[in-house]
Amino acid sequence: MGGCSTRGKRPSALSLLLLLLLSGIAASALPLESGPTGQDSVQDATGGRRTGLLTFLAWWHEWASQDSSSTAFEGGTPELSKRQERPPLQQPPHRDKKPCKNFFWKTFSSCK
């Protein structure tokens, strides 16, 4: 509302939320350590998925932070300046409303 733009902060907050969500999903998908230990191939596949997920999240976080830093150097977004240039929306004049009619045989009221 003021002169500050919160657009640059949204990608980092969104990336943190996505990071928490995906790390929770990845942690719940991992096998428990107290289970059978003879499943080396399953653990290798899980480790590969985890590495791929972490690589993707690191890339995505870097991309989101580059996006937010580039908008900070541009001097704001053009949409914000267009909004500030427009006059505020004018509301139509308030009309006198008739009182609502309550129809006892129906389940609704009629307001015109």
Curated annotation (Swiss-Prot):
Superkingdom of origin: Eukaryota
Keyword Signal on entry: yes
Keywords: Cleavage on pair of basic residues, Disulfide bond, Hormone, Secreted, Signal
InterPro entries: Somatostatin (IPR004250), Somatostatin/Cortistatin_C (IPR018142)
Listed transmembrane segments: none
Keyword presence, Cell membrane: no
One Pfam family of this chain: Somatostatin
Signal peptide location: 1-27
Region (Disordered): 66-101
Location relative to the cell: Secreted
GO cellular component, one term: extracellular space
Gene Ontology MF annotations: G protein-coupled receptor binding; neuropeptide hormone activity
Disulfide bond annotation, renumbered to this chain: 100-111
Main location: secreted
Tissues showing expression: Interneurons in the cerebral cortex and hippocampus.
Family of this protein: Belongs to the somatostatin family.
Known role: Neuropeptide with neuronal depressant and sleep-modulating properties.
Name recorded for this polypeptide: Cortistatin
Native species: Rattus norvegicus (Rat)
High-level lineage: Eukaryota, Metazoa, Chordata, Craniata, Vertebrata
Encoding gene (name): Cort
